[in-house]
């Protein structure tokens, strides 16, 4: 007798996702499980059929072979539908469905849960110069390591952990809830399958101790605020042989007294005197490489921006550099002597006749005023 199509068995389309397949199987398994239908041969066959279909369609490799070649593409030894092995318990039928809820897959007694270690984050503050040029920094991070006294067993030297009497070493226990026999983490050993009657005095039975670890961090030139550097394997160690987590170093750049950063560009104010702005001249300005000279043309107005190309910050992902933007600030003189005040009064007096020619913004402003009152 030929087998029915697995998608037809579960009542799903061929493009159904994992969640839809799992939901369909769960519905059929609850309906036809032998624990609920002890005297029904038909229910037994339908349960076996649904289970076989689910074991193929829930496995990406088997599903791919089935989609290409049909039943002939699925190795019978991997199908899991043979009747000679007997039936699993109700919770075992739903092991992968309830695994996320109750800490592990059903039917896997005796296996300790393996977990990846937690990731760590370290906030590192650096100067703008260090961000621009790159740097190497030494940091100390809190971590946990295997206890050197008990070598990770958690037991006092000369003693050994014992098999948990509650779960018999399985790490999980079954709880009957109506029709369901649910498997969950053992409350006594917390899933390890062992208990420690005589804990290690240095780690308190944890098998791990807190330490400070020194690490060299290489900061690439051009790194920006909030960027993170990943150091694989420098997080907390895994559990039961699991891989360690990662360390993420998050960069924070201190405020600079002169420069403000905008991506790869730098901005700074460039104060100049009233006379230099009017007559022109040459002044020194700071850059990250040192002082540079810049020519100020006559009649320069406050707010004008001078761009120094390539004097910004190197892009962290390329060899290009940003620019340095110098914003002119014409300073009003203060603490004037009587002679200086007298000269300014003379300048004001001789400028009265053609003030608009000497003050372009004032001329523009007066034009707006005249237009306003003319309407």
Swiss-Prot record:
Cofactor: how bound: Binds 2 Zn(2+) ions per monomer.
Residue intervals of the J domain: 5-70
Names of the cofactor(s): Zn(2+)
Zn-finger segments (CR-type): 134-212
Keywords, alphabetical: Chaperone, Cytoplasm, DNA replication, Metal-binding, Repeat, Stress response, Zinc, Zinc-finger
CDD domains: DnaJ, DnaJ_C, DnaJ_zf
Binding site for Zn(2+) 1: 147, 150, 200, 203
Subcellular location as annotated: Cytoplasm
GO molecular function: ATP binding; heat shock protein binding; unfolded protein binding; zinc ion binding
Chief location category: cytoplasm
Cellular component per GO, a single term: cytoplasm
GO biological process entries: chaperone cofactor-dependent protein refolding; DNA replication; protein refolding; response to heat
HAMAP family xrefs: DnaJ (MF_01152)
Function: Participates actively in the response to hyperosmotic and heat shock by preventing the aggregation of stress-denatured proteins and by disaggregating proteins, also in an autonomous, DnaK-independent fashion. Unfolded proteins bind initially to DnaJ; upon interaction with the DnaJ-bound protein, DnaK hydrolyzes its bound ATP, resulting in the formation of a stable complex. GrpE releases ADP from DnaK; ATP binding to DnaK triggers the release of the substrate protein, thus completing the reaction cycle.
Record note on quaternary structure: Homodimer.
Domain notes per entry: The J domain is necessary and sufficient to stimulate DnaK ATPase activity. Zinc center 1 plays an important role in the autonomous, DnaK-independent chaperone activity of DnaJ. Zinc center 2 is essential for interaction with DnaK and for DnaJ activity.
Similarity field: Belongs to the DnaJ family.
Protein name: Chaperone protein DnaJ
Native source organism of the sequence: Azoarcus sp. (strain BH72)
Taxonomy of the source species: Bacteria, Pseudomonadati, Pseudomonadota, Betaproteobacteria, Rhodocyclales
Primary gene name: dnaJ
């Amino acid at each position: 007798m030929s087998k029915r199509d697995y998608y037809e068995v579960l009542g799903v389309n061929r493009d159904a996702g994992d969640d839809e397949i799992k939901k369909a199987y769960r519905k059929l398994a609850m309906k036809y499980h032998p624990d609920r239908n002890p005297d029904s041969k038909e229910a037994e066959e339908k349960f076996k059929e649904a289970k076989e279909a689910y074991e193929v369609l829930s496995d990406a490799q088997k599903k791919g072979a089935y989609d290409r070649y049909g039943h002939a593409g699925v190795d019978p030894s991997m199908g899991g539908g043979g009747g000679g092995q007997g039936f699993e318990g109700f919770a075992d039928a739903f092991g992968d469905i309830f695994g996320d809820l109750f800490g592990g897959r059903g039917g896997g007694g005796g296996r300790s849960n393996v977990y990846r270690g937690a990731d760590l984050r370290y906030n590192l503050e650096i100067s703008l110069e260090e961000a621009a040029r790159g740097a190497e920094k030494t940091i100390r991070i809190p971590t946990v390591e295997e206890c050197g006294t008990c070598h990770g067993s958690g037991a006092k030297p000369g003693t050994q952990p014992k098999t948990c009497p509650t779960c018999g070493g399985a790490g999980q226990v079954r709880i009957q809830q109506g029709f369901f026999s649910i498997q969950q983490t053992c409350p006594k050993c917390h899933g390890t399958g062992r208990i420690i009657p005589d804990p290690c005095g240095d780690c308190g039975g944890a098998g791990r101790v807190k330490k400070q670890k020194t690490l060299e961090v290489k900061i690439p030139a051009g790194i920006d605020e909030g960027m993170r550097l990943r150091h694989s394997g420098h997080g907390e160690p895994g559990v039961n042989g699991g891989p360690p987590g990662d360390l993420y170093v998050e960069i924070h750049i201190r405020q600079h007294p002169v420069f403000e950063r905008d991506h790869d560009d730098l901005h700074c104010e460039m104060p100049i005197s009233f006379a230099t702005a009017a007559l022109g001249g040459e002044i020194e300005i700071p850059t990250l490489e040192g002082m540079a000279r810049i020519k100020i043309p006559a009649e320069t107005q406050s707010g004008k921006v001078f761009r120094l190309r390539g004097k910004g910050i190197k892009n962290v992902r390329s060899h290009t550099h940003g620019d340095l933007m110098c914003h002119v600030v014409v300073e009003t003189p203060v603490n004037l002597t009587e002679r200086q005040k007298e000269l300014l009064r003379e300048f004001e007096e001789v400028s009265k006749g053609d003030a608009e020619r000497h003050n372009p913004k004032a001329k523009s402003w007066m034009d707006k005023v005249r237009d306003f009152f003319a309407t």
